[in-house]
Structure formats: C-alpha cells, structure tokens
Amino acid sequence: MACLTDLVNLNLSDTTEKIIAEYIWIGGSGMDLRSKARTLSGPVTDPSKLPKWNYDGSSTGQAPGEDSEVILYPQAIFKDPFRRGNNILVMCDCYTPAGEPIPTNKRYNAAKIFSSPEVAAEEPWYGIEQEYTLLQKDTNWPLGWPIGGFPGPQGPYYCGIGAEKSFGRDIVDAHYKACLYAGINISGINGEVMPGQWEFQVGPSVGISSGDQVWVARYILERITEIAGVVVTFDPKPIPGDWNGAGAHTNYSTESMRKEGGYEVIKAAIEKLKLRHREHIAAYGEGNDGRLTGRHETADINTFSWGVANRGASVRVGRETEQNGKGYFEDRRPASNMDPYVVTSMIAETTIIWKP
C-alpha cells in the first residue's frame, strides 16, 4: 500500500502531459512570499506562453475587500525541485485588472531600467550574497543556541564544521542542490560568523534575472525550512549585542568595468554611489541601522567609505580588481531583507544613467 511519501513523489510525466505550475509572488509586506498551483498542459519553458492568473489581494494586504482582484503576470520559469518532472515554479509580478503595477510591484520599474538602451548596452552583472538566520520554530531563537542562553563568542563558527559549531547544514545543502536543480545560478554557500547564520550566493546574473533568481532561491529556502520545521529570518540584526548582522552584499560590474581601463570606470561609479548614499540606504532594507554600526565588518550607516579589500567599508574593491585594472566591486550596504529588484536596478541607474 502506498504511503504519503510515495504519493508526494509520484512522477506525473509517466502518465500525463499535464504539469503543475506553482505561481509565486511577493505579498503586501514586500518580503512575504506567496504561491499557489494550477494544472496546465505542458511542458512549458517560455513564461509568455503561460496564462495570467489572479488572487485575493485583500488577504495579502495589497487590495481592498470591495475590489480585491490582483493579476499575476508570469515573468520567469524555473524547474520545480519539489514536484520534479516537467513541473515548474513561476515567478510573477502583480498588476491591477487595468494593467497598472500595484505599489509593491518593484519588478516593473526595475525591468524598465534594465531594458533602457544605456543599461542594456553595459550588460550589468550581479552576484548577491544572501545571508539568513535559522531559528528554532517554537522559541524563535537561533538554531543550535541553548534555550534562553548564548553560545560561545564568535570566532569558530564562520565556515566551521562539527556539531558544536555548525547548525542546519542539512537544510543548507538541500537548498543548494534544489537551487541548482531549479536552474538558479547559485554559486556557493558557507556558514557565517554568527552561529545559526548561513549565506548563499547567486550569480553572476545579468540584469533583471538577478532579482528573479534571488527571490525564487528565497522561496525554495522557505519551502525547505517549512519541511524541516525550522524558521528562516532575513532580519538584518536578529540578535542584539556582540553578534554579526545579516546582509546581502551585492557584487556588480558593467561591460566597461570588465574591459581594460575598467578600474577608472569603477572609481567613477563609486563616486556616484557616494553622492547618492542617503537614497541608497533608504532603499536597502528595513532595520539596516541595527546592522550598519561600523562594527562587525560593516561601515557606519551615516558615512560612505570605500577601500581595497576593506570589509569595514561601504563599498569594497577586491585586491584582484585593483591589480588587474578591471573587474567588479562589492556594495556591502544592502541588508539581508533588501528587495533585489530595487537594489540591482538602483545601482545600475545611479552608476550608468544618473548624471550628478
């Protein structure tokens, strides 16, 4: 007799051409991911071939009850690591029935920036280092920490191994493989400085695809932690005191930066970022003031700085980039709860389009 696991793992491709498409969108808080599934004829690899759908926006904080319908526009397709076969995950953005982007649809403006001729010609590349913290479900206390108490001081946990230093590796590895299966360009993982905190990296990705991939990677992580009975938080400072916060360092380059003489282009771009520091900080995530203190490998939130190999700066340039005279730089200011659509497009807009 079949058990529940057998039925969950049924391979539909043996018996039907129908597929399950899981439509994913961002809810009213700007950080809560929502999803629901529908049956379609398959296989499908082009999002433009997928139908639009709708949902009750009054239940997600995105529409009033008397006019609650919000329309989902499919934008990117990924393979579904949970259902497998020809089943898919579909990243969507959200519109009114009249076709206007709703206020929480940050993808719409980002796509406009990335499709502008100036930005498209520069082919911006991004590598995003997404940090997060795993919490015990019943206590909201970091995984591996004693209930009501604290582990030993930071030091042995970064990239650490062993049962007393590494907590949640099964979740991290499952997420790593699931992202690779889905077609996300996840480039690595590591344990972070605070115990119970981890990081995955997505990229290099070009333009709008960076935001799509980070959001779907977050979705997959939340689904895996759901299965494991663990809570994932993207709070930039989940534990007050002498503990590292969580960021989303954003590595960035343009075609001009990757060519000979690119280091001068990088320095000019950093100068532009300095001039718009306040605007960027305002868009780089909620609660970032608790993280950007000038301690724990961060710069002070009120002061812009940059340096070569300096992890205490707002922007870090790698030693290799300096030596080669071309390459990329790292914006270390974004918080772990930042919206990648906002951050990636804002960096491109400031460094390519904006004229001081």
Swiss-Prot record:
GS catalytic domain ranges (all copies): 106-356
GO annotations of cellular component type: cytoplasm
Tissue: Found in all the tissues examined with higher expression found in tissues of the root.
Keywords for this protein: ATP-binding, Cytoplasm, Ligase, Nucleotide-binding
Keyword flag Cytoplasm: yes
UniProt domain GS beta-grasp: residue ranges: 19-99
Gene3D superfamilies assigned: Glutamine synthetase, N-terminal domain, Glutamine synthetase/guanido kinase, catalytic domain
Reactions performed catalytically: L-glutamate + NH4(+) + ATP = L-glutamine + ADP + phosphate + H(+)
Nucleotidyltransferase as UniProt keyword: no
Gene Ontology molecular functions: ATP binding; glutamine synthetase activity
EC number(s) given by UniProt: 6.3.1.2
GO BP terms: glutamine biosynthetic process
Subcellular location: Cytoplasm
Annotated family: Belongs to the glutamine synthetase family.
Quaternary state and interactors: Homooctamer.
Protein name as catalogued: Glutamine synthetase root isozyme 3
Gene designation per UniProt: GLN4
